[in-house]
Design a protein with these regions (language model features):
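Acidic, mature catalytic/reactive cores of soluble proteins
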Residues: 1-276
């Protein structure tokens, strides 16, 4: 059920590269729910959607619309439900992608490396949770394991959108193997909490992001100053790379806002139930 890269060779051959990475999970990003009340206002568009779905089915092309009728919302997605469930199993596995501070950019199953033979030459990679070990990609920049805030933010959004369609009908284990069932809205919030926790003080008063910087952990003048690192250690959430990457790591503010709105909704619902 996972999405993998494929190398297209000059001689027409295709070589699968079975690396479980954030690239395979990014198929979740292209997700949109078309609400029935909106579709009722544009009947011609609805009619063309039906033609589009039938055309792709007839020509055996990958479906973007899995279910289509006149009475429900419509989900546009590259990932059908059966495949989504398999992707979520990997996404929420602590031995694969799920870390205390978010989703790793490469599965931890590649700790011992992955390689592929191409015309007698071997190419490979392995899980690297923090700084990269190669200078080929700009020195300390590394997409082979660490948590990157902007990509995680897109996952949080995608999961919330999928929840708006599936609601409580789709339940997954959180984390995988725990027996604890959650809907995708709860998964979205859990992921948001993990990302926010990177900057929060733990029980010892330490912020994971500042793990290697005693001055920012203990000094009274600096301990409450938060640095927005480029990316974060895939196992312990330590800040890595440029420490001034506010441009994308600052999106954590949107996640704090999301969690606050969720809490307000819960409180209002509880008050309403008490009145009833």
């Amino acid at each position: 059920g996972f999405f993998y890269d494929v190398l297209s060779m000059p001689d027409g051959r295709y070589i699968p590269v079975k690396v479980r990475s954030l690239v395979g999970l990014s198929t979740l990003f292209a997700t949109l729910v078309l609400k029935k009340d909106m579709l009722d206002k544009v009947p011609d568009f609805h009619r063309r959607l039906k033609w589009f779905q039938q055309y792709r089915e007839k020509n055996q092309q990958y479906l973007v619309i899995e279910e289509l009728n006149d009475h429900d919302d419509i989900l546009l997605s590259l990932v059908p439900k059966s495949r989504l469930e398999k992707l979520m199993k990997a996404l929420l596995d602590e031995n694969e992608f799920l870390s205390p501070g978010g989703i790793r950019s490469i599965s931890k199953i590649h700790e011992h490396g992955y390689s592929v033979d191409i015309d007698g030459q071997e190419f490979g990679l392995d899980y690297q949770p923090a700084e990269g070990t190669s200078a080929l990609f700009g020195g300390n920049s590394n997409w082979r394991g660490p948590v990157w805030m902007p990509m995680n933010y897109l996952l949080v959004q995608a999961l919330q959108t999928l929840y708006e369609y599936h609601n409580d009908e789709l339940q997954v284990e959180l984390p995988t193997g725990s027996g604890n069932k959650a809907n995708l809205g709860e998964v979205s919030n859990d992921l948001a909490k993990r990302l926010v926790s990177i900057f929060e003080k733990d029980t010892n008063g330490m912020r994971p992001a500042n793990m290697d910087h005693p001055v920012y952990q203990h000094n009274e003048h600096f301990k409450d100053l938060v640095l927005f690192y480029e990316y974060f250690h895939g196992d312990n959430s330590r800040g890595v790379g440029a420490s001034h990457q506010t441009g994308w790591t600052g999106v954590v503010a949107e996640l704090i806002n999301k969690l606050n709105k969720t809490e307000v909704k819960k409180m209002n619902k509880k008050k309403h139930e008490m009145v009833m």
